[in-house]
Regions:
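Beta-strand-rich binding/interaction modules
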Residues: 214-250, 634-645
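Accessory beta-strand-rich segments of carbohydrate-active enzymes
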Residues: 26-28, 35-38, 94-199, 224, ...
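Extended carbohydrate-recognition surfaces in non-catalytic/accessory domains of CAZymes
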Residues: 22-116, 173, 179-182, 194, ...
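Extended substrate-binding grooves/exosites of carbohydrate-active enzymes
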Residues: 36, 64-66, 134, 185, ...
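Intrinsically disordered, low-complexity Pro/Gly/Ser/Thr-rich segments with frequent PxxP/GP/PP motifs
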Residues: 249-267
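Short glycine/proline/serine/threonine-rich loop/turn segments at secondary-structure transition edges
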Residues: 155-159, 267-278
């Protein structure tokens, strides 16, 4: 009996040691203090923050208002809209108080003698991170995820470490509402010294068929000496959680090169929007026979092809993108990430028949990408609205030359294992596209994509068609993406070598839910005394169009590979056509769905064409029109049916 007790004690101790060896990842959500304003001494451990506001992260400090016309007034000429003279833009960034400096403070405990990393999914913006009074890292771009090893700054016993984050948003730094603060999650990651770093795995599928898939896993190992023997045991789990294959490999880290394992998955379940099957690779890392890390990588098995003149193929089947562009805010909820709200948005889009999302014009929250993996949406992930030439006085151009490569690498490493991502975009309507050296900048960014992820093509949203056809810019991009300019698709196809055209941004029809204007006719930049737009879906801006043109292009040509409509949802800021001295307008009217997540009439137009599994019959406008007695009120039907009869 005594021997059994000793054995049991040894087993318990062994289990405890193994548990301690596992990584831990914690969301730092609660027990934060926040204050608007600049307090340089707030980085120090002994700073008194008791009078600060208690907040929960994610947190958008600006969404609480108040709305005010004077918040971030911008006197600019929007060259993308062909404006030549500057004018006062009211509500361009939503009329919310995002400008200024704010501080966040909290504390955390970790075990002693561990490696500790802080991962920020996004911090708006110019984030300076302090641990125990010392600056641990700086990251200027508020949309990107970044991480920093804070081990050197920790208290020796790992207890009561002070974390302070300073954020600053400058005026005229955005064309829409960016949000403010720690609006995405903050992760505390604790590992052994030898471990897999953040985004430390890369999974590719060199061969995919119905019979089998070849899966390649490359794993980075940090802090392993050249003499350390590394053993990695990896199991591949199927979508239903069963182990379908496993490998054990030994070796030594060779000059920082990743550890490679290759697998065969028989009869794979292929990822697609209709069947978003997800696998998982679970890797255990041993250093000199001691378990030091366990790391899980979710991935999908699917094959993408872009074939000249033929179009886009997913798993061998031809299809066209039925996509929308979305900004990152959640309307009245602000920019703070909210998984339930994102899921609700995607559910509405799924029912409409949408199968793709463009993250305009910035890196998305990881939660959105994970939901697209799970719910079956293809993604075009896009990082930048400007490069080295400014759109906004205090925009990203200030950091581009120094930070662009680092921002690109973080984005690519963060999302290259997600099967939903089927292409990268390197920018949106950047003024650099017309620069004499614009193609060199584009090539610089595209080459980074090819280097870090050779499995996906690159596009760019181009609106200056004459420039990019003449200067080599469009010819160099893997997949030419045209924003609007539907009348020039054929010309671009004829002149460019790729023999494919993507509608990277289309339509921009404007409408207000439940508002109908008479007489009913096509209009550009129409404005009314009530600051609304007609929901007859016949109004657009001077530079945009109604949906019909884009549908016709999709029907007529195999070489058009689909579209991303501007936008799926209304968003805060950019209230075209009421963007010039037109307060109180402070949100867009482009959305197929409004700020409250209520579908507009246009939703049913897209649903009738895109959702081929559902019946759609939607009639507009409504029935009662006091004051229009004796006048003709046009009735419009959106339906998938070849014919139907309306009886009044």
């Amino acid at each position: 009996m005594k021997h059994q007790k000793q054995l049991f004690t040894v087993l318990l101790m062994s289990a405890a040691c193994m548990l301690q060896a596992q990584r831990s990842e914690t969301l730092l959500e609660k027990n934060w203090k926040f204050s608007k304003g600049d307090f340089p001494e707030a980085a120090q451990t002994d700073y008194n923050d008791t009078k600060w506001e208690s907040v929960v992260i994610p947190h958008d400090w600006a969404i609480f208002g108040p709305f005010d016309m004077n918040n971030d007034l911008q006197n600019v000429a929007v060259t993308q809209n062909f404006e030549k003279k500057a004018s006062l833009k009211t509500g361009r960034t939503g009329g919310l108080p995002y400008v200024g400096t704010g501080w966040y403070r909290t504390s955390f405990d970790v075990p002693a003698d561990k490696e500790v990393t802080l991962l920020f999914d996004g911090a708006m913006s110019e984030a300076r991170v302090y641990v125990n009074g010392q600056e641990a890292c700086f990251w200027p771009f508020g949309y990107n995820s970044f991480h920093c090893n804070v081990t050197p700054f920790l208290n020796k016993d790992g207890k009561n470490n002070t974390l302070a984050v300073r954020l600053e948003n400058r005026p005229q730094s955005s064309r829409w509402y960016p949000g403010a603060g720690l609006y995405r999650n903050v992760h505390l990651i604790v590992t052994e010294k030898v471990h897999i770093p953040v985004w430390g795995t890369q999974i590719t599928t060199p061969h995919v068929s119905d019979e089998f898939a070849a899966v390649r896993l490359q794993t980075k190992i940090e802090n392993a000496g050249e003499k350390t023997e590394i053993r990695i045991e990896t199991e591949i789990l199927s979508p239903d959680g069963k182990v379908v294959t496993r490998k054990e490999n030994k070796g030594r880290i060779n000059h920082g090169q990743p550890f490679e394992q290759n697998f065969i998955v028989n009869a794979p379940q292929l990822w697609s929007p209709e069947s978003p099957a997800l696998y998982k690779a679970v890797s255990k890392v041993y250093a000199d026979n001691q378990l030091v890390d366990t790391y899980s990588t979710r991935f999908g098995i699917r094959n993408i092809e872009y074939i000249a003149d033929k179009g886009f193929y997913l798993n061998g089947k031809h299809r066209k993108f039925q996509g929308v562009c979305n900004h990152h805010d959640l309307g009245p909820l602000g920019a703070a990430i909210n998984v339930a709200a994102l899921r609700h948005q995607l559910t509405l889009l799924k029912d409409m028949g949408c199968d793709a999302i463009r993250t305009s014009h910035n890196m998305p929250a990881p939660e959105l990408v994970e939901l697209c993996d799970e719910m079956g949406f293809m993604m075009m992930i896009e990082p930048f609205d400007e490069w080295d030439i400014a759109k906004c006085e205090n925009g990203y151009h200030r950091y581009f030359n120094e930070w662009a490569e680092r921002d690109m690498v973080n984005m690519l490493h963060n999302y290259r294992n997600n099967p939903c991502v089927v292409m990268w975009s390197i920018g949106n309507e950047v003024p650099t596209q017309c620069s004499p050296v614009g193609y060199k900048v584009a090539k610089f960014l595209q080459d980074i994509c090819h280097r870090e992820d050779p499995t996906r093509p690159v596009t760019c949203g181009m609106d200056q068609v004459t420039c990019v056809l003449a200067n080599g810019f469009a010819a160099m991009i893997d997949i030419p993406g045209l924003n609007y300019r539907a009348n020039r698709y054929q010309e671009a196809y004829d002149k460019l070598p790729q023999n494919l055209i993507l509608g990277s941004e289309t339509a921009s029809t404007v409408s207000s839910r439940g508002v109908y204007k008479f007489p009913v006719k096509d209009k550009k930049s129409a404005q009314y005394d009530d600051h609304q737009c007609s929901s007859y879906d016949v109004e657009a801006c001077s530079w945009s169009n109604i949906p019909d043109e884009d549908f016709a292009l999709a029907d007529d040509h195999h070489w058009t590979i689909g579209q991303f409509v501007w936008t799926g949802f209304d968003y805060l800021g950019e209230p075209s056509p009421y963007d010039t001295d037109a307060w109180p307008n402070h949100s867009s009217m482009f959305g197929i769905i409004d700020l409250a997540s209520l579908p507009k009439d246009r939703y049913y137009l897209y649903r009738s064409i895109w959702n081929k599994e559902a019946e759609t019959l939607h009639i507009l406008p409504h029935w009662t029109w006091p004051g229009r007695e004796g006048e003709v009120t046009p009735a419009v039907s959106y339906t998938h049916l070849r014919a139907h009869e309306t009886v009044l």
